[in-house]
Amino acid sequence: MDIISALPVTIVFVAVFALIQIPMTVAVGLRRLQTDVPFMDGGDSVLLQRMRAHGNFTETVPIALLAMAAAELAGAPHVLLWSGGTALLLGRLVHYATIVTTGFGTGRAIGMLLTLSSLVLFPGFVLLKTLGVAV
């Protein structure tokens, strides 16, 4: 069995998140060039916002995708995978946009709630399935 047939939903989200990370990485790099700050943030608030938005993305997305893959391998229904993956995607986009624009606000909280919902949903399914609870 190949990865596409084993993880048909997760693999789509892996590809989408990988592509989304490219402009985030480029935004940090471009700001570094503009400010001549090769390391850390140099006291530049815009660079710091971009770094943290990118950093938060890279801190949360990989573990969420691993949990999603585990849920898919454990037999999670596609509706659960698509809804959890979409919540993660929307959550990360809203959170990123809020951090790089204002840094604070309702969008940031909504983004984290959507992200956390997938971080509860996927491993929750796996644990229930592992414990033999009907899901």
Describe the residue ranges of each PLM region.
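Juxtamembrane loop-transmembrane helix junctions in multi-pass integral membrane proteins
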Residues: 1-8, 46, 50-56, 72, ...
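Juxtamembrane boundary at the C-terminal end of a transmembrane helix
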Residues: 124-135
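Interfacial loop-to-transmembrane junctions
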Residues: 94-120
